Amino acid sequence: MQTPKEILQFVEDNDTFLITYYAKKYGKIITRKGTWTKPNTDTKGKHISINGDECFFYWDINAEPNKNGKQWRRATNPTRCEVA
């Protein structure tokens, strides 16, 4: 299990990555392919703490865009990040 600091460094250092975390929406642990920067822009993801949870906002490469055309997703308390 990686620390939040290790995960943040990893996503900042790699163009694409696989991030693993528990998704309440699905009720299970999932792994998603993402980037820290929105494609074709300089807009970066964010790492913040919300009510004691470590939250990473990343661009999900394979996600269906939401109604605003966005593919930003929140990984809460991710357990692992690795090269895609």
Regions found by a protein language model. Give the residues of each.
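Short, compact, well-ordered microdomains
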Residues: 55-84
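Acidic, low-complexity, intrinsically disordered interaction modules
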Residues: 34-50, 65-67
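Residues in well-ordered beta-strands of folded domains
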Residues: 20, 35, 59
